[in-house]
Design a protein with these regions (language model features):
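Sterically constrained small-residue positions within well-ordered secondary structures
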Residues: 36, 59-61, 112-116
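Short capping loops/turns at secondary-structure boundaries
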Residues: 3, 83, 114-118
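Acidic-leaning, charged glycine-interspersed low-complexity segments
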Residues: 16, 88-130
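Small/polar-rich, solvent-exposed N-terminal microdomains that initiate assembly or binding
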Residues: 1-58, 78, 84-89, 97
């Protein structure tokens, strides 16, 4: 799987399950749009590759590892409830799932707290793809 195919597979699943499935605005790296101006819950999604290893000798076969980082933001006055619910939905959509040639591992949810005028919760999703 090429890097382009990998990123597209992850973004497609995130769009289907979270952006569309949960009706949440999602911004990806290098997205020219900014956060929603109406104060609604939104997500910044980044895909970071870590290691690539060769899994077979002979014709090249490689396994790519990395993490998807979903930074969830919502108005401070609403607290963390909606963000933690969304983090749970992300966990259900990815944890232990194989889709589009990508295998997702155990999801970690990290409440961050107040960030500017918003409350933040981060979700980390490890992945592997061949």
């Amino acid at each position: 799987m090429t890097d382009s195919e990998l990123h597209n597979a992850i973004r497609d699943r995130f769009d289907d399950e979270i952006a569309t499935g949960q009706s949440v605005a999602v911004l990806y790296d290098n997205d020219p749009n900014g956060p929603p101006a109406d104060g609604s819950v939104w997500c910044r999604c980044s895909i970071k590759r870590t290691d690539t290893i060769q899994v077979e000798s002979g014709p090249a076969s490689y396994r790519r590892h990395g993490r998807v980082y979903a930074q969830l933001f919502g108005p401070v006055e609403l607290g963390d409830g909606d963000l933690l619910d969304l983090a749970d939905e992300i966990g259900s959509a990815f944890e232990g799932v194989s889709a589009g040639g990508v295998r997702y591992g155990a999801v970690t949810v990290r409440p961050i707290g107040v960030s500017g005028h918003e409350y933040q919760v981060n979700v980390e999703i490890p992945f592997t793809a061949d």
